[in-house]
Amino acid sequence: MVAARTASLSSQKIISEAKPNLTDLRSFIEKVRQEFPEDVLTISKEVDPRFEITALVAKLEQERRFPILIFENVKGTKFPVVTNVHASRRRLAAAIGSEPRSAVASYLKRIEHLIAPQEVATGPVKEVILKGDQVDLRAIPQIVHHQDDAGPYLTAAVTLARDPVSGRLNCSFNRLMSIDRNHTSIHLTLAKHLWEFYTNAEKLKQPLEVAVILGAHPAWSLGALNIGSIDEEEFYLMGALAGEAMEVVPAETMDLKVPARAEIILEGEILPFERVDEGPFGEFTGYSLGSRKREVFHVKAISHRKDALLHDIAVGHLDHLLLSTIPMEANLFRAVKAMVPSVKAVRIPAPFTVYVSIEKKTEGQGKNAILAVLGADLYMKHVIVVDHDIDIFNDQRVQWAVGTRCQADRDVVIISNVGGSDLDPSDLKDGVTAKMGIDATAKPRLDSFTPRHRVPKDVLDNLDLKDFIPASWLAQKDRKS
């Protein structure tokens, strides 16, 4: 597979040897605890997995606090739960050795230097192995996140599968709804890679073997969300993002390699021609989507650490919303750069929405950037492009640019009946949507647009607030911010 991988990604360097590591979820949490001690909170009081875990996340969000939460005592199970791991851009950036503002650049730089996985004989995830009648998913924490959810869900499930036609590997996030001791539903996003693998398997009248990873280093999460060619095998991306080779071990029941230092692995198959009612479920959009027919996952084996943690994602909260931003922004930055080389930054501020900052050299580049975004990611349906003098991390400044540099009849692009997300509650039918782009750049260019009013730079630079305002007032203002 390494040779095939090299051929399909000739522009990227593959490192086949790397130093053995301890790159796992626990080591990441410990790293966060050491560097940002306020970012890890352990709760020893018993918590009910039905609503209380999400309620605690929501209560802390109301206080503008987003720590990793470790629940040591979860009602009805021996397994602790960890959630809110991704609820900080600072933590996600730290997972790839970066600062928050440079996370996209660091992501793109790292995935240019791929690191092959390192196969080992065994690992912590093999400490307990359950097969056949020993399998009981009900022993795992049964977390119900929102009041309208149809039942318990596994929301941090990273699915690993091999295409039965091409032999290519893929990792992706797929939610699982508990059905019984050895079955769940599985949500396959329309037209994505795992959906295509499963479609190929159904055409062959066979199940699709998959392994589901529950609890691994955030590099697995970020790599699983990478948007790339179907020829890419994300194992190499995981190592690149972590900066170390990922240790893998053979699965118990299939010809797949799984992360040796995961917390829990589910092995099984997505059954052909079988569907089950799934949902309602509260999604990342903030809405509870209704019941739909979904595929069925039959679990044949579970392996886990003796003291395994169940990784949960607080659906629809910051933990969920931030996770996809860095890989999606990186993909969009790369796509826009191919069309507009002077792109400066990309930001996803809300579901289905993206801001793009460019240094416009010629008229028309604003709309070129819009088309590049809409063609690069099915999920994106609203694009706002601004000049490089606008801070796209400041929503107010972006809206100021829309209000002062845009004319709707000239600068708004609307495309009807195109492929989008089947999780969008506003679409008319599964995955079909309308998309809009707003070119909020100055016309024809920033340097020839109506000048902005400014306080002279030398006056701003030389003025010190402490010379005019009491220190006690300044300190009070700092405490409130």
What are these regions (language model features)?
Residues 2-296, 300-480:
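Extended, highly charged
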